[in-house]
Each structure stands twice: as structure tokens, then as C-alpha cells.
Amino acid sequence: LEKLLRTQFPDLNSKYVRQFALLFLDLQKKCDSAEISTKALDLRGMLDALRLMRRGVAAGAALDMGITNKAFDSYEQGLIRDAIAARIPAQLTAAKLFD
């Protein structure tokens, strides 16, 4: 996953390459334990969120659009937001995210 992120986003800060990979694994664990539905485990949504961040959208809003909003249940969305907040600051900007 880290290799894919580096290929798609060569200018992504290496610290955040690792954090996004770990975020995906965290969501995968939540899916495996049936805490959240598999709809939230969407690699394409994460890549799209990174593209939005590159264009200037704050990380929290971009990840909401790309991942969190795929879940319809508000409790499930809360679990997803908590997993995201543990890895990625909501106000993270493109200037800090990309080199």
C-alpha cells in the first residue's frame, strides 16, 4: 500500500505515506471485526481524498467525502472519524502533506 501511495503521490511526505497506509489497515481491522461495513474500506476513496487535499481541501473534509460518507449509519461514521482522527489531523493542509 505504501508503494502504491508513493507511486500515485511521489510528493507525499513519507510520514503521511505511513499514516495513510496504517489508516487503511485500521479500517480493514474494523471491517474484519464487523465494527464497520466494508463500504468504508475503499482505497479509491482514500486516493480521491488525497487528490482533493492536493487541490487545497482540508484533510478532515476530504476524508469525510472520500471515506466517511460511504457509511450511512451515524454511529459507524463516528467510528470511522475516530480512526481517521487518530492518524490524520483534520486541519492538515496540502503545504504540510506534500513536499
Q: What do the predicted segments below correspond to?
A:
Residues 1-99:
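C-terminal regulatory/interaction module of P-loop NTP-utilizing enzymes
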